[in-house]
Amino acid sequence: MSMLCYTLIIAFLIGIWAAPKSEDNVPLGSPATSDLSDTSCAQTHEGLKTSRNTDQRHPAPKKADDQELGSVANIIVDPKLFQKRQFQSPRVLFSTQPPPLSRDEQSVEFLDNEDALNRNIQAKRQNHPVHDLGEQSVCDSISEWVTKTTATDIKGNTVTVKVDVNLNNQVYKQYFFETKCRNPNPVPSGCRGIDSSHWNSYCTTTQTFVRALTMEGNQASWRFIRIDTACVCVISKKT
């Protein structure tokens, strides 16, 4: 009987000694598990914070298309600004497509695709004035709507002209109606109809100032710029 008791006691002690003592078998919520969880959470939080800081210091590069669209969208103009009379000019127009050649309006305009198309159709239907065969211009000129990227302002400085403008979430182009000489010498002697035996003559393009939307740093501002507006004959008496 005593031998049986000794055998059971020895087996019990061997079982206790052989039991695993690793922290993996510690019950959930014990101090060892809490320390491991806190350490793991702290390391994870620190890793996320470091990742965010790295992303902020090294932002992902933007695509070229995104940068191009951003440069257009950054310049947003309030349409009320154009209602002021001092900013209106018959030679400046904002449109989504090239406007017709006829310049029949006397103020700054905003044309969308449909309006510009209707204006083009109306311009084609207009009857051109018929001149008598004996009437001819002293100088031949050509008129057209153009866009500009740079121009000379009233102070003689070269400025950047805003081509695309965001108005009411729609991109418009800024057009200028220019008139220039087709040829400085429409006839071999110079201007047409000038007595070349007494006068020297030639045709030249003259300019005037109009208000245009320009860029000054990152700000859009109004400036007077020079554009071609007429073709005139210059004469001088022969000596």
Curated annotation (Swiss-Prot):
Q: Which Pfam families match?
A: NGF
The record's GO CC annotations read: axon; dendrite; extracellular space; synaptic vesicle
Specify the propeptide location in this chain.
19-125
The places in or outside the cell where this protein is found are: Secreted
This protein's source sits in the domain of life called Eukaryota
Indicate the segments annotated as coiled coil, or none if absent: none
The tissues where this chain's protein is expressed are given as: Expressed by the venom gland.
Question: Which of UniProt's keywords are assigned here?
Answer: Cleavage on pair of basic residues, Disulfide bond, Growth factor, Lipid-binding, Metalloenzyme inhibitor, Metalloprotease inhibitor, Protease inhibitor, Secreted, Signal, Toxin
Query: What PROSITE patterns does the database record attribute to this sequence?
Result: NGF_1, NGF_2
Disulfide bonding pattern of the chain:
139-203, 181-231, 191-233
For this protein, the record's InterPro entries field holds:
Cystine-knot_cytokine (IPR029034), Nerve_growth_factor-like (IPR020408), Nerve_growth_factor-rel (IPR002072), Nerve_growth_factor_bsu (IPR020425), Nerve_growth_factor_CS (IPR019846), Venom_nerve_growth_factor (IPR020433)
Q: What biological-process terms (Gene Ontology) are attached? A: cell surface receptor protein tyrosine kinase signaling pathway; modulation of chemical synaptic transmission; negative regulation of neuron apoptotic process; nerve development; nerve growth factor signaling pathway; neuron projection morphogenesis
Residues of the region (Disordered) are: 47-68
Record SMART domains: NGF
Q: Which family does it belong to?
A: Belongs to the NGF-beta family.
Q: What does this protein do?
A: Nerve growth factor is important for the development and maintenance of the sympathetic and sensory nervous systems. It stimulates division and differentiation of sympathetic and embryonic sensory neurons as well as basal forebrain cholinergic neurons in the brain. Its relevance in the snake venom is not clear. However, it has been shown to inhibit metalloproteinase-dependent proteolysis of platelet glycoprotein Ib alpha, suggesting a metalloproteinase inhibition to prevent metalloprotease autodigestion and/or protection against prey proteases.
User: How is the quaternary structure described?
Assistant: Homodimer; non-covalently linked.
The name under which this protein is listed is: Venom nerve growth factor
Q: Which organism is it from?
A: Pseudechis porphyriacus (Red-bellied black snake)
